[in-house]
Amino acid sequence: MAGEKIGIAKDVTELIGNTPLVYLNNVVDGCVARVAAKLESMEPCSSVKDRIGYSMITDAEEKGLIKPGESVLIEPTSGNTGVGLAFMAAAKGYKLIITMPSSMSLERRIILRGFRSELVLTDPAKGMKGAISKAEEIKAKTPNSYILQQFENPANPKIHYETTGPEIWKGSNGKVDALASGIGTGGTITGSGKYLREQNPNVKLYGVEPVESAILSGGKPGPHKIQGIGAGFIPGVLEVNLIDDVVQVSSEESIEMAKLLALKEGLLVGISSGAAAAAAIKVAKRPENAGKLIVVIFPSFGERYLSSVLFETVRREAENMTVEP
């Protein structure tokens, strides 16, 4: 993990963490609270999942569960955890097999194959549950294999408790009043939230989920376009009792906000960042939050979504451009 001051990093793992916080200024009309984004899009492989890729592999090594050059790592993922594991596996010498719903962006497939990870696509109608089942099926017939289990692995929230939470506290000079985070595995809000609550019991925690798959709000799982959150079940690592409120955001809202963040803030981020921002802005408009500071997690960089609906219009424009004489 990244230290405060570093000359030349000994390897890529020392580049993880210590991502910046930045205020949102031009998409916050009507807000009575300030909103600052934690740019996890600036991790070495462009997402918050770089943290848990490091944490889960390191934890398993320390427990003697896996060994480079011998163990085969397996993980079901919507993509970013796969990438976080893929660069770690490449750096440490592991074979990695990823199972992923075929509905996830093409960029994810290309990046995973770029790290020479083996990729098995699963039925998108079965969501993450289908990817999990396929991972278990592969493990049963693969010697020396180990599933890292991001949805159940305590090393997931642990790294956020040890790094993300402290970074938010220090970066805000201890003035953070609330944290808003999309819920995929639940590791980010659980680990970061627990740390922030220990520093200030009054810190509010807001989870974000798709309105189309509002499990935490008592709804049913359903298809949506916010890749990375709304897995359709309540993950084992998520401590639901920590959360003060769950804010629902639609796929359309999330996509539009992600576009606005690029156009008005100069922040090229993914759809789940748009969802988190939309939710944080809703919270920042509530009268009881006047004068407060809300930190929102932006999980990933927009370039990973070029083939998705987020960039559909500009992609078509780019494809149809002609050469000027």
Swiss-Prot record:
Binding site for pyridoxal 5'-phosphate: N80, G184, T185, G186, G187, T188, S272
EC number, UniProt record: 2.5.1.47
Modified positions (N6-(pyridoxal phosphate)lysine) in chain numbering: K49
Cofactor field: pyridoxal 5'-phosphate
Main localization of the protein described in the UniProt heading: cytoplasm
Entry GO MF terms: cysteine synthase activity
Entry's Gene Ontology BP terms: cysteine biosynthetic process from serine
Metabolic or biological pathway: Amino-acid biosynthesis; L-cysteine biosynthesis; L-cysteine from L-serine: step 2/2
UniProt cross-references to InterPro entries, sorted A to Z: Cys_synth, Cys_Synth/Cystath_Beta-Synth, CysK, P-phosphate_BS, TrpB-like_PALP, TrpB-like_PALP_sf
Record's keyword terms, sorted: Amino-acid biosynthesis, Cysteine biosynthesis, Cytoplasm, Pyridoxal phosphate, Transferase
Domain of life the protein comes from: Eukaryota
Record SUPFAM superfamilies: Tryptophan synthase beta subunit-like PLP-dependent enzymes
Compartments where located: Cytoplasm
Reaction equation(s) it catalyzes: O-acetyl-L-serine + hydrogen sulfide = L-cysteine + acetate
Keyword Amino-acid biosynthesis attached: yes
PROSITE patterns: CYS_SYNTHASE
Cellular component terms per the entry's GO annotation: cytoplasm
Family of this protein: Belongs to the cysteine synthase/cystathionine beta-synthase family.
Description of how the protein assembles with itself and partners: Homodimer.
NCBIfam families xrefs: cysK, cysKM
Protein name in UniProt: Cysteine synthase
Organism of derivation: Solanum tuberosum
